[in-house]
């Protein structure tokens, strides 16, 4: 299988608007021990679980859900904080702030395709189309991510 890297998506943490870290503009990931953590996709390998594993952190899980909107709503209700991908931080608008984490953590976004000798002609055409399409629209994708960074 061939992995084709397209972009790195910065990782964030959703906190209630009145959370002390909002004034800092960044969330020190070790601060998680002082907060109630809402585990999104519990028991599964997720971007959040991989991020915590990379920092050797075991967050104090208070609530669990497999629904991103439920996690967002719990954060908005002041029940805790949760991690979120940069491309997803503006799905809903409420009393929640998405803060970049420190140290920063990025999630690679790309496509996986069979090796050149094993890829079907249709899959090869789609791969080629997707790569051209992404390259032509990469600026727009970056604008969306950078716009998220400002919110």
What are the residue ranges of the model-derived segments?
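Beta-alpha-beta core module
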Residues: 1-10, 24-25, 70-118
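A local structural motif
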Residues: 53-62, 96
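Short helices/loops that flank or line small-molecule/ion binding pockets
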Residues: 30-31, 53-55, 68-79
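Short beta-strand-to-loop elements that line the ligand-binding cleft
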Residues: 39, 58-67
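Residue-level recognition of the GNAT/N-acetyltransferase active site
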Residues: 16, 40, 114-115
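Short secondary-structure boundary segments
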Residues: 17-18, 43, 85-88
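Secondary-structure junction motif
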Residues: 21, 28, 33-56, 119-127, ...
């Amino acid at each position: 299988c061939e992995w084709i890297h397209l972009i790195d998506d910065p990782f964030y943490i959703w906190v209630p608007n009145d959370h002390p870290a909002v004034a800092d503009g960044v969330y020190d990931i070790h601060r998680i021990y002082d907060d109630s953590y809402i585990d999104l996709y519990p028991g599964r390998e997720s971007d959040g679980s991989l991020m915590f594993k990379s920092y050797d952190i075991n967050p104090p899980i208070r609530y669990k859900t497999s629904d991103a909107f439920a996690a967002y709503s719990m954060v908005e209700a002041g029940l805790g904080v949760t991690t979120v991908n940069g491309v997803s931080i503006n799905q809903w608008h409420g009393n929640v702030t998405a803060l970049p984490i420190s140290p920063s953590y990025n999630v690679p976004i790309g496509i996986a395709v069979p090796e050149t000798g094993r890829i079907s002609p249709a899959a090869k055409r789609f791969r080629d189309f997707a790569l051209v399409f992404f390259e032509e629209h990469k600026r727009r994708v970056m604008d969306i991510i950078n716009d998220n960074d400002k919110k």
